[in-house]
Amino acid sequence: MVPVTLYVDIDLEEYIKSYGFVGPLSAKSDLKETARQVVEFELARAGFKAKVHLRKPV
């Protein structure tokens, strides 16, 4: 398991407006899940089978 920290520089208010989120917490949750899916997809595309988690699995 390799821990990775990822920072996304985005206009959160614009993201909230564009996707109709109620507030910043739901928008941040969506961004985290989107980033997780993209990383997992790109690793699979490169031929690596990996499960990407937002938190360390127990």
UniProtKB/Swiss-Prot annotation:
It comes from the Viruses. This is Gene 72 protein. The gene is 72.
